[in-house]
Amino acid sequence: MSRLRTLFLLPLLASLGSCSMVVLNPAGDVAEQQRDLLMVSTALMLIVIIPVMALTIFFAWRYRQSNREARYEPDWDHSTHLELVIWAVPLLIIICLGAVTWMGTHLLDPYRPIGRVAAGKPLPPDVRPLEVEVVALDWKWLFIYPEYGVAVVNELAAPVDRPISFRITSASVMNSFYIPALAGQIYAMPGMETRLHAVINKSGDYEGFSANYSGAGFSGMRFAFHGLDDAGFQAWIAKAKDSGGKLDRNGYLELEQPSENQPVRHYAAVDSDLYKAILNMCVEPGKMCMSEMSQIDAKGGLGMAGIRNTLPLLYDKFARRGTIFGPAPSYVASICTTEEALAASKADQSATPMTSTPIVGAGLQRPLPLSIRLPSPSATGTLRSPFNS
């Protein structure tokens, strides 16, 4: 029977061999520091967990009913030494854990530029980070390289030992950008920009994906991340430039349409202001950018005239989530002149009736004219117009 159990467990153990331990065996310095922080925190917590588990088993065995040699002290209720151990050890662990976590949180702040390439390898003073603009779409990833003027869908590459500066946003709902081998995950939100600084230290092919549910195609939001040497990275950029095609605003509006499991796509050129337009939610022609709107609001706004030139503002253009709690928010479509605003105001106030015929219901007679008899001025005094001073 024991041999059959062993044979039954062998396939299960073999299946575990295919599991990736990328979180505990990363390829980037930031991810390695996060791994170390995780291991230290776990070790500190095990100082409490292991003795508690061991003592639970020990007391259950030591003071079992059949053990007549165990001491029986029903009136025992206090021990100063035991109280000191019970409270002092967890308190010291919490202090150490808090200090380690606080320092690690600030050192690994994703908005903070990295200060080294790897452990014992400082950052060269003349190195310039690789800028990558990341856009989360439904349901794919767009990566723009402003330094090289190329854009790629569902594929990312970076040279080894060169710092990477990610600028991340979303064109639809809230999402999450995560490459376990490189660094921790960070959110991507529409109309907002998050930052991530990291570096890849080992050549290889890794996987990135969305770590935040975002709809029907969420499971297919995966992309390949390549860590390349300088020559390999330049060849990858050259391949993107040779692919042809330009990603302009019209092309982007077609690309952002919801689609699932999209193949890798390269663009040899990209509109230099495309990412800013995506971030400010003004890719559509004629739409006012959020940055322009905020500048107008900072100077006092447009007043009542501004409410006449609005169109629906849709964060999720294709599903319109969240509108059940009220009308959809709006944005200013254009700026009118003073004359145009006054003309629009007068047009709204004028109401010319289409017909003066009284409304008569089915089978009802025409209503009789209503007469009101006003009191004479001699009885009430001179009537004063509300417009007279």
Language-model-detected regions and their locations in the chain:
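Cytosolic-side junction of a single-pass transmembrane alpha-helix
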Residues: 53-67
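Generic alpha-helical scaffold signal
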Residues: 51-54, 75
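Hydrophobic alpha-helical segments
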Residues: 1-52, 59
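Structural signal for membrane-spanning alpha-helices in multi-pass inner-membrane proteins
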Residues: 13, 56, 97-101
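Non-transmembrane, membrane-proximal soluble domains of secreted or membrane proteins
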Residues: 20-38, 63-365, 369-389
